Structures are given as C-alpha cells and as structure tokens.
C-alpha cells in the first residue's frame, strides 16, 4: 500500500512539472515581475530613417525591465547620473516599482510590422479646428502625452493611442479616459515619482509631499499597461538634441525637456518615420490658446521656468526644415 501511494505521489509531481512547463512555455500565465524581461524587439528596416544622424545608438529598447535594468544602466551610462536623467542614487526606487509591473514589452507580441510610421501628437492649440483625427488614426503608432484628451476631441486628434507619456502630476485620474489598448509610460523626474507609482500599485496611502502640484490619488490603469521610460531617452533629449549644459549656473533653475520633446525622442528610437502634430506655438499672441483643450493661454508658457521653449522651438524648426520629420500642423 505504501509503495502504491509513493507511486501516485511521484506521478502527480511529474504531471505538475509537465503542465507547468507547457503552460509557462506558451505564456498562458502572467510572467512573474522579478523575471520580467524583454520578449520582443524592434523590427529592423533595410534603410536608415531620415533622423538617423541624430542618434548615437540605434534599436534601443526604451522601457526598463526588472531583470536587467541595472545592467542596461551600466551599459548606457545611466548609473553615472542622478534622476531625472539617470538612476545613480535611485536604483532601489526603480527596482521596487519595476517589481510590481507585469511587462516591459514594447509592442504586442503579435505585432511584427517593420519600419513603423509614427505620429507624435502634441497638445498645442494649433490643433483646434484642424480635423486631423482621421489622418492621425491611420498611423502605425500614435504617441500622446500627459492629460491631452481624446474623448470629445476625436475629430481634431483622433481616437487611438498607442503610447501616452505621463508623470504623477499630469496623469488622468478619471476612468472615462482609460483606453485598455494604450501603454502608459512613466517619465520619472524625481524619486517621489517612483514612490508614488509603487504606493498606487500596492494600494498604500499616497504621500503627496515633494510634488509641484497634487498628483493623482488613484490609478485608472492596470499594471500590464504601465512601463517606466529609461532615463537614457530623457538624457538624449536634453544633452544630444537640445544641447543643454550638464551643470547650470547657480542663479538659474535647471532646464528640462518638455514631455513633447521626450516623446519625439522616444519615437526616434522605435519608429522608422516620424510625423508631428500640435507642436506649433503662437508667441505673438499671448491670449491665444495654449492647448487644443481647456482655457489656458500662451501667457502660461511664457512663465514656465523649467523648460527652454526657445531651444525646443529651434530644434523643431531645424528637424522640420531638414525633412527629418514631417509637420502636419505647419500652417
């Protein structure tokens, strides 16, 4: 009898092992966060993109993965900078936040379209009454930012969103804005941003200290939708594209790239062709609308001490005139 029970036990163990291997091998079950790593790659193209000369590295995976983020940081130099452009003193914050996410994939595992044509949709008032929605929705990849709404503005900006960049102070908190097909990308500028994400994912009380305005107190997105942007992307925008100094004079506030420029930089790394919409500002009329939504005016942009809007406009003018990108809202 005892031998019979042992045989049954061993058979059960073997059956469990076989089923375990089959199910995990076919990705039926969720991948454990601590083992989270890249499962797909950017499809290469035979020809170089028009903007290739702007980048020092190509085919860079833009999202951090729990399995190798420290190795990637060392390889690309992010371990030599503090936030917002590195993780030298914040690696543990990154580790904790990444451990609660379910994926660091770039595209859906069944998406094998190479040479992607992308549009980066800014929030500029120039989009008002432009009726670009249908055209925007025709792109392979649509990148949006912050709390620029789609709902109620479909004719102007379209319906689809592939990626949306955000930070704690700019993310939607009303579930009406959640599109389950959108990947949300946290751009971390300070340790508080990572702590905020961790607290939300764990269901803890949110510590609102250290933010320039009150961050969202609830998360309308599922963990599978969230990614953390590699600081290398933001660093590239600041130092390689906008040529910001690494050290600002003591009497000046450090300048950082806007989310729009960061989104364009992201597009350079994952797309073969990049088009822009909503990146033109009317500085000649400070009463003109700042965004295609809401009532904010251009006077608000003039008061922003944390961004160098002049440098960004010169950069945009340069890449448009050189045909490195196509501007859908030129006029």
Swiss-Prot record:
One of its GO terms (molecular function) is sialyltransferase activity. Residues 1-4 are cytoplasmic. The keyword Transmembrane applies. Residues 26-331 are lumenal. Signal peptide: none annotated. It comes from the Eukaryota. It is found in: Golgi apparatus membrane. The gene is ST3GAL6. This is Type 2 lactosamine alpha-2,3-sialyltransferase. Keywords: Glycoprotein, Glycosyltransferase, Golgi apparatus, Membrane, Signal-anchor, Transferase, Transmembrane, Transmembrane helix. Transfers the sialyl residue from CMP-N-acetyl-beta-neuraminate to the terminal galactose residue on sugar chains of glycoproteins and glycolipids. It's alpha-2,3-sialyltransferase activity is specific toward type II glycan chains (Galbeta1-4GlcNAc) on glycoproteins and glycolipids such as neolactosides nLc4Cer and nLc6Cer, whose sialyl-products serve as precursors for the Lewis X antigen. Critically involved in the synthesis of functional selectin ligands needed for neutrophil recruitment during inflammation and lymphocyte homing to the lymph nodes. Belongs to the glycosyltransferase 29 family. Glycans are attached at residues 129, 181, 282, 295, 308, 327. Its EC number is 2.4.3.6. It comes from Pan troglodytes. One of its GO terms (biological process) is cellular response to interleukin-6.
């Amino acid at each position: 009898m005892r031998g019979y029970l042992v045989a049954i036990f061993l058979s059960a163990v073997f059956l469990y092992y076989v089923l375990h291997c089959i199910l995990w091998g076919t990705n039926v079950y969720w991948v454990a966060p601590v083992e989270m790593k890249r499962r797909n790659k950017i499809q290469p193209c035979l020809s170089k993109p028009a903007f290739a000369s702007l980048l020092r590295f190509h085919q860079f995976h833009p999202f951090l993965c729990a399995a190798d983020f420290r190795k990637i940081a060392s390889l690309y130099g992010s371990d030599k900078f503090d936030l917002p452009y590195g993780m030298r003193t914040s690696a543990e914050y990154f580790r904790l936040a990444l451990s609660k996410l379910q994926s660091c994939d770039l595209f859906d595992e069944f998406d094998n379209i190479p040479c992607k044509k992308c549009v980066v949709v800014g929030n500029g008032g120039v989009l008002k009454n432009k009726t670009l929605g249908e055209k925007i929705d025709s792109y392979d990849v649509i990148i949006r930012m912050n709390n620029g709404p789609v709902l109620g503005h479909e004719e102007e900006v379209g319906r689809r969103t592939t990626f949306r960049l955000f930070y704690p102070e700019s993310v939607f908190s009303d579930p009406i804005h959640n599109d389950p097909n959108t990947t949300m990308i946290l751009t971390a500028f300070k340790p508080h941003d990572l702590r905020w994400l961790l607290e939300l994912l764990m269901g803890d009380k949110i510590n609102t200290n250290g933010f320039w305005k009150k961050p969202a107190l609830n998360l309308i997105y599922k963990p599978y939708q969230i990614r953390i942007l590699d600081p290398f992307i933001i660093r590239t925008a600041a130092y390689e594209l906008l040529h910001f100094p690494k050290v600002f004079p003591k009497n000046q506030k450090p300048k950082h790239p806007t989310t729009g420029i960061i989104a364009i930089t992201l597009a350079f790394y994952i797309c073969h062709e990049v088009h822009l919409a909503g990146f033109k500002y009317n500085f000649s009329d400070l009463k003109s609308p700042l965004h295609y939504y809401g009532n904010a005016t251009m006077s608000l942009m003039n008061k922003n001490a944390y961004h160098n809007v002049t440098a960004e406009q010169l950069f945009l003018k340069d890449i448009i005139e050189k045909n490195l990108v196509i501007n859908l809202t030129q006029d």
